[in-house]
Curated annotation (Swiss-Prot):
Pathway: Nucleoside biosynthesis; alpha-ribazole biosynthesis; alpha-ribazole from 5,6-dimethylbenzimidazole: step 1/2
The EC number(s) this enzyme carries: 2.4.2.21
Record's keyword terms, sorted: Cobalamin biosynthesis, Glycosyltransferase, Transferase
Record SUPFAM superfamilies: Nicotinate mononucleotide:5,6-dimethylbenzimidazole phosphoribosyltransferase (CobT)
Identification of the protein by name: Nicotinate-nucleotide--dimethylbenzimidazole phosphoribosyltransferase
Keyword Transferase: yes
Family indicated by similarity: Belongs to the CobT family.
Function in brief: Catalyzes the synthesis of alpha-ribazole-5'-phosphate from nicotinate mononucleotide (NAMN) and 5,6-dimethylbenzimidazole (DMB).
Enzyme class: transferase
């Protein structure tokens, strides 16, 4: 858990800026959390918030459950989009470029491997895709454990290289099915409340998707977290959960994207509850399961734009709000320094 000895001092710094108490709303909460995180292990409160090297990690993986027709897109699209990310042509590339966010793609196991020596591609393949969880376990326990280790290693390396804020994105056809199954199995919420439209399926396809997800969830009752990850998890989702754990271990904040990334964050908090203190939430997505996981994490997202793209786009769009919180904390005058009396 975050050490709280500097919380009152940081709150005083915020309250003493030249504004009415609380007038900057949620930005004040963001500044408090960032300053508190950056005060961990220090002898005094952080009087300056550093956000100089944001890092987006985009985890890609394919899913055997795609064979059940739960998405309108074929698994080949995962590789095509990874190539698009590496070429700089996707929405996430546009938003990362706009805000000088470094983007790295992690191949956690996609059906069609990418033949590329791109500097921003990391290979941590656990296979070509998960097994079809509608009929068998998606992953082995060994794959789950390796995925968690992979995520921890990748995040730790980026932090060692200077990253002071992490953001995670994802790509994987049928990964909303895995995320919905994980959410239902881990939280006990009904499957039909966790399943959404993903790539834009119709009512008939949605009904089918709910039945498919329920088949996997039905095997999960009474299982441990790791066993549930093996039953219905995804390579990229579990790897991401490991990255969340490493971020907390290295006292680095993470700006959480949409539904799938939030499910990975939830998994990480079940494995390591202290992870929650390092999470800020970018947005509320259109996937209906996202509201459930936000409630479980007691999260108040910064934006509500009707997004349902994934890729980390919501996090990249919310990043300037974190910069704004740091800017007022670092540079806004106090009543005393400005000579303002109230």
């Amino acid at each position: 858990m975050l050490e709280q000895q500097f919380a009152a001092e940081i709150q005083h710094i915020i309250d003493n800026k030249t504004k009415p108490l609380g007038a900057l709303g949620q930005l004040e909460q963001v500044a408090l959390q960032l300053a508190l995180i950056q005060s961990q292990g220090k002898e005094q409160a952080a009087t300056h918030i550093e956000l100089k090297q944001p890092q987006m990690l985009l985890f890609a993986g394919d899913h055997g459950v795609a064979d059940e027709g739960v998405s309108i897109a074929p698994s080949a699209v995962t590789q095509q989009m990874v190539l698009n990310f590496l070429a700089g042509g996707a929405a996430i590339n546009c938003f990362c470029a706009l805000h000088s966010i470094d983007l790295t793609v992690v191949d956690c196991g996609i059906l069609l491997p990418v033949d590329s020596d791109a500097r921003n591609l990391i290979l941590r393949r656990l296979g070509s895709r998960t097994a079809n969880f509608a009929i068998e376990s998606a992953m082995t326990i060994e794959q789950v454990e390796q995925a968690l280790r992979n995520g921890q290693q990748i995040a730790a390396e980026k932090i060692a290289q200077g990253a002071d804020l992490l953001m995670f994105g994802e790509m994987g056809i049928a990964n909303t099915s895995s995320a919905a199954a994980l959410l239902s199995a881990l939280s006990g919420h009904e499957v039909d409340h966790c399943v959404g439209r993903g790539t834009g399926i119709n009512e008939e396809q949605l009904s089918h998707k709910i039945k498919v997800v329920a088949q996997g969830v039905g095997r999960c009752e009474g299982l441990s977290v790791n066993a549930i990850l093996a039953e219905v998890g995804g390579f990229e989702i579990v790897t991401m959960a490991g990255a969340f754990i490493a971020a907390a271990e290295h006292k680095t904040p993470v700006l959480v994207d949409g539904f799938i990334v939030s499910v990975a964050a939830y998994i990480a908090t079940l494995l390591k509850p202290e992870v929650r203190d390092y999470l800020l939430f970018a947005h509320r997505s259109e996937e209906q399961g996202h509201q459930i996981v936000l409630s479980l994490l007691e999260a108040k997202p910064l934006l509500d734009l009707g997004l349902r793209l994934g890729e980390g786009t919501g996090a990249a769009l919310a990043y300037p709000l974190l910069k704004a919180a740091a800017q007022f904390y670092n540079n806004m005058a106090s009543f005393e320094s400005a000579g303002v009396t109230v």
